[in-house]
């Protein structure tokens, strides 16, 4: 379990834009998702063109959801893909798990400079 700033988490990820850890995604014991920006790193990243992550426009807000935020869920293979079983087998996963998929794939897309670690 990870404890960060009074948030009891089962998982914690840093969200990178280029080389900057601009935010954190936490998954709590109660399966709640929390996203918060790292304000110090956001200020550094702004000097290189960063503005905000889609769906998280207010950099001072703490975002909470009972489901994985669309920004993150769109970065992993969909549970409904026709070849999802092949993908899971190739990744050595027995079943579909958003958290493990995010961890394994690092949420990388060819279309942007974000990475989830």
List the predicted regions and their residue ranges.
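Phosphate/dinucleotide-binding and metal-coordinating scaffold of catalytic cores
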Residues: 1-117
